[in-house]
Amino acid sequence: MTKYVVSGYIGFDNFGDEAIAHVLVDKLKAKGAEKITLISSNPEKTTSLYGVNSVPMLKFLEAIKETDVLVSGGGSLLQDVTSFKSLLYYLGVIYCALFFGKKVEIFRQGIGPINSKVGQILTKFALKHASRVSVRDKKSQELLNSWGIEAELLNDPIFDLDLPKKNKKGVVGVQLRNYPTLNEAFLNTLADEIVKRFSDKKIQLLSFQDSIDLAVCEKFARILSKKGLNNVEVLKGLSVNDVFEKISDLEFLIGMRFHANVVAIKSGVKALAINYDIKVKKLAEEYDLPLVELKQKDFSKEFDALIG
């Protein structure tokens, strides 16, 4: 029997990464794993949620020494757009596992962008020594192939879930997150389209990670209210299963976060994506979702595509 350590963006109450952890833990349990340990920013909560071992993010060394396999992923761990320090951390976990002779599996990640030369060199070396590499999109596979690294192309882990397809008429979901270039002008233009198209429907504003999403969701609710739309609800404190349930109930979703759009696709909900990150653009291209840019001033064509 095999022992596993999982390295990911776990314990931050981010819906997408917690949903991935949920899928991954279930897969490892189904394989008959002897021991599963998640590296987490909130080990106590992680252990409670998943029923497995958990260690703090800066105290993973002993867990790696005792394990057989390190699983890195999923999500977008290996990129330096968020920060170079973040890339170094996740690579550091991989390098520790390699140093102690452990197998390393890269699990369905979106790789890049990695803009720094040092970051590219360190990532190439780490992945060339991994036992198995799988990625969640074609462009990540092409990047790794250009580095001489074989990578298996698989769906994002959320696509493995059997999600309900209720698609109730009359409910529109809007999922926003804070972002430096998400400004008042964009929110007002978005609100104008929603008022124009969906004034007869219930609007649900979905906060996936309250520390990042909630303030902008509440701000957008106020903007909609000023424009005369009062059938608006802000949903916060959502668990992974809450999100699956809420999105599957929707008729339409306007989604900013990558995994909001993934869940909509999997649940058969018509979605319009907001492009704040290259991973969202890749997903929209792959699944033919209408896509609006944060600098865009007219969304009528994209809303026509959503409704049509």
Model features per residue range: what roles?
Residues M1-G308:
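Active-site anion-handling motifs in enzyme catalytic cores
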